[in-house]
Amino acid sequence: MQTASLSVFPQYLLPKHALTLLAGRIANAEAGNLTTLLIRWFVWRYGVNMNEAINPDIRSYRTFNEFFTRPLLLENRPISDADYVCPADGVISQLGVISGDQIFQAKGHNYSAAALLGGDTRLAEKFYGGNFATLYLSPRDYHRVHMPVDARVSRMIYVPGDLFSVNAKTVRGVPGLFARNERVICIFESEFGPFALVLVGATIVGSVATVWHGVVNPRDSEGARDVQEWRYDSADLVLKKGDEMGRFQLGSTVVMLFPKNEIAFNPAWAPGRTIRFGETMATKADPAK
């Protein structure tokens, strides 16, 4: 039986939705010099490299969220010619094979693909025995998420949930963390097959937005809402490799799912590795191997 670690027990007691609502309002406030002071402190505290931003001037950002979702100079993130490229800056939390329907979270903790995908077993079956990668975006990272490959948007599902932190300690301590936190599930169809990008919320993550929809989970009220789904069968929503697909307004985690025999990860990819948007992530799997 998977049990929670005592080290994360206080998170069960915190009013996480209320704290996140408050943080979102602060992050969107135009507070002049106070906003600049907050951004300056954040840059110092987390070692943010502003030289990579299109706009490195801290004083010019009207809100903290405007700073947090700042675009990068794209010449700093060249797009690999590999079949699949890394969709975000961050650290690899875990990656590997989906064992039946089970995805590895941390030692002693697995969760099911169906649970991650909002209980949709039929959708989850596409990924049984496939591959997954979990990418953690720390506070210092660039927080836009990009396309790993050319693909058409097929479905999007919003699943309300909890808002535990997604740092390493919490990942080790909270069973089924990514399948219980609030998340936005994006399903794509590429020339190689379907895949899922799951944008997982966390404590004080202001909201999640996609380029085709805008903000999916606006922080205008406390607490969870119902599951919502959008289908794009009749729409021609095609995004190219390297295009922005979404962003976090305060950071979190991306979980990627691929069917069996679809991809072969870059051999250099391993848990704990620092990664950058645009680098080689994977190639199309060789069926003969």
Curated annotation (Swiss-Prot):
Protein's organism: Nitrosospira multiformis (strain ATCC 25196 / NCIMB 11849 / C 71)
Family affiliation: Belongs to the phosphatidylserine decarboxylase family. PSD-B subfamily. Prokaryotic type I sub-subfamily.
UniProt-recorded name of the protein: Phosphatidylserine decarboxylase proenzyme
EC number(s) given by UniProt: 4.1.1.65
Cofactors required: pyruvate
Pyruvic acid (Ser) modification, residue list: S252
Enzyme class: lyase
Cofactor binding note from Swiss-Prot or TrEMBL: Binds 1 pyruvoyl group covalently per subunit.
Active site: D89 (charge relay system), H146 (charge relay system), S252 (charge relay system), S252 (schiff-base intermediate with substrate)
Keywords (A to Z) from UniProt: Cell membrane, Decarboxylase, Lipid biosynthesis, Lipid metabolism, Lyase, Membrane, Phospholipid biosynthesis, Phospholipid metabolism, Pyruvate, Zymogen
GO terms classed as biological process: phosphatidylethanolamine biosynthetic process
Quaternary structure and partners: Heterodimer of a large membrane-associated beta subunit and a small pyruvoyl-containing alpha subunit.
Signal peptide bounds: none
Role this protein plays: Catalyzes the formation of phosphatidylethanolamine (PtdEtn) from phosphatidylserine (PtdSer).
Protein's membrane topology: Peripheral membrane protein
UniProt subcellular location: Cell membrane
Any one annotated GO CC term: plasma membrane
InterPro entries named in the record: PS_Dcarbxylase, PSD-B, PSD_type1_pro
The gene coding this protein: psd
UniProt site (Cleavage (non-hydrolytic)): G251, S252
Keyword Glycoprotein: no
Molecular function via GO: phosphatidylserine decarboxylase activity
Post-translational modifications: Is synthesized initially as an inactive proenzyme. Formation of the active enzyme involves a self-maturation process in which the active site pyruvoyl group is generated from an internal serine residue via an autocatalytic post-translational modification. Two non-identical subunits are generated from the proenzyme in this reaction, and the pyruvate is formed at the N-terminus of the alpha chain, which is derived from the carboxyl end of the proenzyme.
Reactions catalysed, as given in the entry: a 1,2-diacyl-sn-glycero-3-phospho-L-serine + H(+) = a 1,2-diacyl-sn-glycero-3-phosphoethanolamine + CO2
Biochemical pathway: Phospholipid metabolism; phosphatidylethanolamine biosynthesis; phosphatidylethanolamine from CDP-diacylglycerol: step 2/2
